[in-house]
Amino acid sequence: EVFSKMEREAYLTAFRNRDATTSFDELQKRIIDLPYDGNNYDSDEVVKLNKVSIRYGDRTILNELDWTVHRGEKWALSGENGAGKSTLLSLVCADNPQSYACDISLSGGSGYRESIWEIKKHIGYVSPEMHRAYLKNLPAIEIVASGLHDSIGLYKRPQPEQMAICEWWMDIFGIAELKDKPFLQLSSGEQRLALLARAFVKDPELLILDEPLHGLDTYNRRRVKKIIEAFCHRKDKTMIMVTHYESELPGTITDRIFLKRNR
């Protein structure tokens, strides 16, 4: 069900009036009940790779990989070090320079013949590499808001309703009180939570999480895992998650892919 702009805004502002302590169950309910904005695609095939090969010099990273991700599936991506997990995610996110030479479709169309920004509009993404490269000393809320436009920094000033959804997700991740603090003054764990909020902020159709619990303390690992599980219960959401640890996977995983390193 798609809600009106007013209904969505009323939902977002309601959290300000609630009790400051929120149980994980309440947190999950808030995420599941978040009104949809109607910016959905309706293709059954969200990602389709047809005999995709990636080589760097004389080293083959991916060799004739066929892989289809259907709408609503939740994939666990695992494999040996150097097997190409991060490379595969960069292809799906349209961040790999070799993407355009490969037979890849996203959202049911010829993905790479579309504007890269059209592709990214549907994707939320976070990874340890992104965290290491993120050196913008903007207020934390502007880092989160940059996920609305898929920029590293903010190039457009967010509208009030956009700031409301940013604050809402920062509250979900437990960092609302840090919204005005410069990103580089946050602890490493707080930075990771801000980048996670950035990945979720546009309620993406495809959520790509590369080691999302990396660098978090025990409490926040539990919190983020619950957030991921709740997000997966939203209608037609698709997820690809990389982790080295089975215990980090949410109970909502439906499919698995394991990459072997090419010798």
What are these regions (language model features)?
Residues 196:
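Hydrophobic anchor residue at the start of the ABC signature
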Residues 145, 160-178:
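Conserved ABC ATPase "signature" region
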Residues 47, 62-64, 179:
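Conserved structural motif at the start of ABC-family nucleotide-binding domains
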Residues 207-211:
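Catalytic Walker B motif of ABC-type/P-loop ATPase nucleotide-binding domains
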Residues 135-153, 165:
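Q-loop/switch helix immediately C-terminal to the Walker
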Residues 156-158, 182-186, 190:
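Conserved ABC ATPase signature
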Residues 2-51, 123, 154-162:
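Pre-NBD coupling/linker segments of ABC/ABC-like ATPases
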